[in-house]
Amino acid sequence: MTPPIKKNNTGLDLKQLFIGSEGILGIITAATIRIFDKPQERIVLWVGIRSFKETLKLYERITAMFQDQITSFELMNKKSISIIKQNEFNFKIANNKIFCLIEISNFQKIDDFGDFVINKLSVLDTEKMEIIVSKSEYENQVIWNLRESIPVEERKIGSIIKHDVSIPL
């Protein structure tokens, strides 16, 4: 039995090259998968920020506050967001250069999870950012649809920028 290996997105190593070779360099004979329970509830945040430096501060604060409850932290630039035609939330694109989609999941069965998240967010310096907090599963999906519509809209205008990367922060 092989010991479990945790996924690590902090850089390329020989093991990753071997795994990504699709069988050319070798065959995987065993795998260990860590499975989590489905979250009881999730809240999606849409955050507009004026600078990358402020985004790093937000990331540090959010990870300190929510730790393992963060199931997604996605970063998008102003140009990508400006091509989205429909926007139910009417967020301000002009004031912000960077947008983050942050998903926080309730794995611990916390009662009133929405209030829990909002109370924790109240310590953030919201003067430099615009935050939209989802209030329902429908709004969660609307925010995710904004993110997922970017590649579709890029294909329509003919310029596609692919930059789905993981970096250590």
Q: What role is predicted for each listed range?
A:
Residues M1-E74:
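FAD-binding subdomain of flavoenzyme oxidoreductases
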